[in-house]
């Protein structure tokens, strides 16, 4: 029996003219061998689209507009959780296979009265939240934020002044975020920055799921893995800090997916998303007992990603098509 992966990798198209339920007249059979993937991986580096801090000591405040995101435990044993979300739309071709994902963070400040090294972990968020745009009212206490307004994330709420609360203040494992640590890193001081949460199967799986199902992309929660010890709190550069922003570096293998195959008059047509800077060749053959694939058309590398339309006159009762990256 054909596996799901095999079905996804090969698309069989059989156009038929339906005259009556149960009666079909098929003049020809066409097969699309959906893609021949490039063996070379591509890399993209993304900035977060939203990030903020959940502040236990000021549970109704927001800090979404600050130059930093706080995470860890303060000297007074109060906790901070950092939230980050990256948007993959338009950055990675749909159906691409992700092979690596690294998150790079820079520590921009440590506790004034000393610090303890600590292991921090990334947890995949399971619910949505609002970034907000607040900074601290009191410049001498920049990590406390200021009172949230509607739809801004706080320690208590995913969206302030709505019914969308965290399951428990500060967010709860299982309900608000996955208890699984997707990646971890020991954090020391500013001088050891930047810190890379190196690729793991779980981290890659998080990002792959966001690519395949964008509606599940709520980002990551960053926290100290142990929230018993104090002096582990750190400020990490946020997206507003253009000198020290978080960076998500993704390595992937683009997949070429054929779209909208159809017959129009005496022509067979299909299209696919031609990636910027990549040339392609559409090929055909009428039989696998013949001498091989023949070139139908060459597609020059476009300057930007664009839909390429392939046309062929119907001159055979059976034909196979594929698109390759030379």
Model-derived features: where do they sit?
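Bacterial N-terminal signal peptides
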Residues: 21-37
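Flexible, small-residue-rich N-terminal segments that precede or flank a structured functional core
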Residues: 40-92, 110, 178, 226-227, ...
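Beta-strand-rich interaction/scaffold domains
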Residues: 47, 111-209
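Acidic glycine-/aspartate-rich tracts in secreted/extracellular proteins
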Residues: 89-92, 108-111, 126-130, 224-229, ...
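Proprotein-processing/basic-patch segments
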Residues: 200, 204-254
């Amino acid at each position: 029996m054909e596996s799901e992966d095999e079905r996804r990798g090969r698309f069989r198209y059989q156009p038929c003219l339906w005259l009556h339920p149960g009666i079909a007249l098929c003049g020809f059979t066409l097969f699309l061998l959906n893609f021949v993937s490039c063996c070379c991986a591509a890399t993209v580096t993304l900035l977060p689209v939203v990030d903020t801090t959940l502040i236990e000591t000021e549970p109704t405040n927001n800090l979404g507009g600050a130059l930093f995101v706080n995470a860890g435990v303060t000297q007074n044993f109060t906790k901070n959780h950092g939230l980050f979300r990256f948007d993959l739309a338009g950055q990675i071709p749909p159906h691409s296979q992700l092979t690596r994902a690294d998150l790079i963070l820079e520590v921009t400040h440590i506790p004034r009265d000393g610090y303890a090294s600590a292991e921090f972990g990334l947890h995949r968020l399971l619910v949505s939240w609002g970034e907000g745009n607040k900074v601290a009212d009191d410049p001498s206490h920049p990590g406390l934020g200021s009172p949230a307004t509607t739809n801004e994330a706080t320690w208590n709420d995913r969206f302030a002044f709505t019914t969308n609360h965290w399951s428990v203040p500060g967010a709860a494992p299982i309900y608000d975020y996955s208890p699984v640590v997707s990646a971890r890193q020991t954090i020391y001081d500013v001088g050891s920055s930047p810190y890379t949460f190196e690729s793991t199967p779980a981290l890659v799986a998080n990002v792959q799921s966001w690519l395949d199902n964008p509606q599940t992309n709520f980002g990551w929660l960053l926290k100290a893995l142990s929230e018993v010890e104090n002096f582990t709190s750190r400020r990490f550069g946020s997206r507003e800090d253009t000198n020290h922003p978080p960076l998500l570096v993704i390595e992937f293998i683009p997949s070429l997916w054929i779209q909208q195959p159809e017959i129009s008059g005496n022509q067979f047509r299909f299209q696919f998303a031609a990636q910027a800077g990549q040339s392609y060749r559409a090929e055909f053959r009428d039989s696998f007992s013949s001498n091989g694939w023949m070139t139908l058309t060459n597609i020059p590398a476009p300057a930007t990603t664009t839909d390429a339309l392939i046309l062929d006159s119907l001159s055979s009762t059976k034909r196979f098509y594929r698109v390759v990256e030379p």
